[in-house]
Amino acid sequence: MKKRVRALGPLVITVSSTVVLCGSTLLAWGEAHDLVTARAERETTDATLLGIYNPGRAGFALRTASVASSFRIQTVSVTPGSSIALRVSNAPSRARFDLIVDAGTLSRPKDRSWTWRAPDKSALYRVWVIRTDVPDTIVVNAFVTVPTDRLDGEYLNGYRIGRYPKPPRPIYRHPEGFIEVTPQNLDVWVSPHFQLRQFVCKQRSGYPKYVVLEPTILNKLEIILERFNAAGYHANSFKVLSGYRTPHYNQAIGNVALSRHVWGAAADIFVDEDGEDYMDDINGDGRRDISDIRVLYDIANELATEADYQVFVGGLGTYGANSRHGPYLHVDVRGRRVRWWR
């Protein structure tokens, strides 16, 4: 028996309990998931692979937790069995929306708002927010995490996490759970221009690995990338030198205990369009050095004065090259403006 019909531009899919009708082709539900997801991903990820920058924004925004974003690919983390609210904003009054979920339970819609209750099993699930009057979609990657209380001392399923320090402020509360990383989900696009693999801690281990990843840092990186391209430069993504760090790894490299990397809210980045694993010469002076990073710094720093950017305010710091790496820019979210140059 039919449950609902969704119009997606040239595609019309009828969702039943087991199959989806797409045109004259009968598809398994999993295959239909891929088609719907591909519509949101194709516009940006294909452009990235072809060397063409596309910001990857929808014509509306979606609020999850404290962040409202119009990027077509978004990521949230949620503990097993808990709920998250989703609300559409910045859309015309005539716009009509619907949601498709591949698991969990969805509340009845109210004023463009829904509540999704996550499944009890830790895994990657997806929520599609679809504008039905015109073809426009946001895909939410919902990672149901492995709860922190599953830690056995410093280890989670054999992967060494370490111990989080006592939180001096609310933003340093211990994570409620960890995203499980496997070879199968490494290449998931967690935003239009960044993949999960870019944020995995560098400590040596087998699989599974675990990460914490804040949606705010993903949005901040996407906004900086968008402004970088708008300023006349070109990059399809940033190379992430360091994303999430476990407390164990962070201590091993001698970093400060309260580094925002440990909460999945920081990234060390540089531009590497030529694939040489080193900062590109973006200012055209014939050298690849800290002056190129300062171009990136200035673009990111200018954003801090904008009202819509305040939820992403945090640290911004430049680092020069050494024997282990080239110059890079540190970006984080911490609720207050901090700047440094090294």
Regions found by a protein language model. Give the residues of each.
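Non-catalytic propeptide/linker segments at domain boundaries
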Residues: A118-L196
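Catalytic cores and adjacent binding grooves of peptidoglycan-active enzymes
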Residues: A257-R342
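N-terminal Sec-pathway targeting helices
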Residues: K2-V15
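Extended, low-complexity, intrinsically disordered C-terminal regulatory tails
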Residues: K220-G254
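Active-site acidic/histidine clusters and adjacent loop/turn architecture
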Residues: Y172-Y233
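Charged, often glycine-rich, active-site loop that binds/positions anionic groups
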Residues: S122, P247-V262
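Hydrophobic membrane-insertion alpha-helices, especially the h-region
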Residues: V12-T25
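Beta-strand-enriched, solvent-exposed domains that form extended recognition/catalytic surfaces
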Residues: W29-E154
